Amino acid sequence: MDILSQDIMYLPGVGPHRKEILGKELGIHTYRDLLEYFPYKYVDRTKLYLISELSQDMPFVQIKGRILSFEEAEMGKRKKRIVAHFTDGHGVCDIVWFNGTKYIYQNYQVNKEYIIFGKPTFFNGRFQFTHPDIDDASQLQLNDMGMQPFYVTTEKMKKAGITSRAVEKLTKMLISKLTEPLEETLPPFITTHLHLISRDAAMRKIHYPKSVDDTQRARVRLKFEELFYVQLNILRYASDHRRKYRGYIFNRIGAQFNWFYSHNLPFKLTGAQKRVMHEIRADMASGRQMNRLLQGDVGSGKTLVALMSMLIAIDNGYQACMMAPTEILAEQHLQTIKEFLKGMNLRVELLTGIVKGKKRQEVLDGLIDGSINIVVGTHAIIEDKVQFQHLGMAVVDEQHRFGVEQRAKLWSKSENPPHVLVMTATPIPRTLAMTIYGDLDVSIIDELPPGRKPIQTIHKYDDQMASLYSGIRQQINLGRQVYIVYPLIKESERMDLKNLEDGFEAMQDIFPEFQLSKIHGKMKDKEKEAEMQKFVCGQTQILVATTVIEVGVNVPNASVMVILDAQRFGLSQLHQLRGRVGRGAEQSYCILVTNHKLTKETRKRIDIMCDTNDGFEIAEADLKLRGPGDLEGTQQSGIAFDLKIADIARDGQIVQMAREEAQKIIDDDPTCQKIEYNMLWER
């Protein structure tokens, strides 16, 4: 039996109770799990500080000296605070304990020399160390200490005595049991070419490093390995998919496309739109299924590109569908497409949950007999009952709301899988796109159509509301509409957030001369629909809402977006909300309202929003500030991945390196037959 598959209970120092806590809190069940539970930081244990050199902003430090005396203070019922006065000859500090009286007096003696390791804090005129690590100075060789690893632990673990130091001791115990070198997981041609240390050396050095260089080399090796296998699996999946699924060959540009291009094109295509259309046309004529991700900021003209792609399918005798994440968005796409296709003899229908009875049957019949050219809808389109005569093109809007299973259901609607174009207005940084959407080819529309004015973003504090209300009034009197966004629907006892209901009433009092709508996540779809419709039609001038308006709503007349408690939102979310305005020819504004208590990170977020409208710049900054968040581990190609040490946000260079090495192997062995790569496919 492989030693790393051993149950963690059998490691000396664990036992049944610790096994249960390690399993529940950290998911550590085997020796392998413990070995792959990596430290989050290190502290240099080769250096000693003098008490006279200590300062409050120091992290963990160690000092050498002796205990002068002990002192006790009662702290309520049967609780004591024990203080040891400690000197190194250059100053005096205190060691403080709040429990463990018997242990302390049994193990630590006055005038004996100890090495103290902990974080210094300043209290009552002198530095103190609370519950530090204490070692007998005569038994500790500093040169052997190297870098001390620190492991993330939970409150439950600490209560059970499983501290970072305890995890460190267990890991060292495990490493001492590994008498044989760990099996290598990367082929020699990769480790040699990239100068990576062996897996065995990396695992030992990451838990028991002697120097900073040890930690760096170990981390690079293990991060590369993790990211390499993610990329290899993604590229292998994409390669298999391309070989298995033939695509329809759409090499004809016919009457519908040409008429639209000559008569109905609302504006001259931007250079970016032309480039993307060229990429899409090449895919559709290639004989293999198109799987393309189309990224573009709000208002960049993605829908127009998608429609032109659908017209190519129609000219080649096939049908097209467009899936949206919400009914509101599906209806807006339907109206937009019908407007674009005015005067053209094409049948475009809606299929969502609200299309029922006779009308629904008409749509289902029209899809089967081929009389419907384009259907726009929600997930209702992928229901088993929905069948097409010839589905050749599928457009999916806002991909992160549709997983790989939904895409696969679309493929089953036709003899060959339809060409798939995935649209997203959420800009995805390159390193993340490479991992999350690694099986899709990526196109980017990075220009706005002519005539669009950049949105002005302004930061205001919550004590400047009077001038803000005056500005809102001015805009509405000019005939514009306004969004006011709150972060939560229910009050939180822990956070001073405004309640949307109270906010709505307050806004009615402040703007009695205007009509207001409200939308929040707790409302039924029909209620939301009705309130939204009032705003879209211009019956109401102000929409008070939570972030349910984040995706897709298009009201060209809305020129002001006010985001209250903006410090509570992430960068990408703020950018998405801002994208609800700026859709008409008039100047638009996004007002970020915060309190004065801003952290350094929050201030940075607000500054970035005010400085740029570039979604990709914002996405990169958000990834660095916040990390990949929900996207991590939800690989869209259907390949799950769990990153234990790599960080897509900060390890872009290693992601790129891993991608290049994986691509070389797939190019050299697309069918995974070559013997020299066997170890890679067996993992």
Give names to the regions the model predicted.
Residues 585, 589, 598-683:
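C-terminal accessory region of SF2 helicases/translocases
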Residues 1-12, 24, 230, 240:
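Long, highly charged, low-complexity intrinsically disordered interaction regions
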Residues 263, 267-277:
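N-terminal pre-Walker A segment at the start of P-loop NTPase domains
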Residues 37-68:
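OB-fold nucleic-acid-binding modules
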Residues 73-264, 668:
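Upstream accessory/linker segments immediately N-terminal to the RecA-like ATPase cores of bacterial MutS
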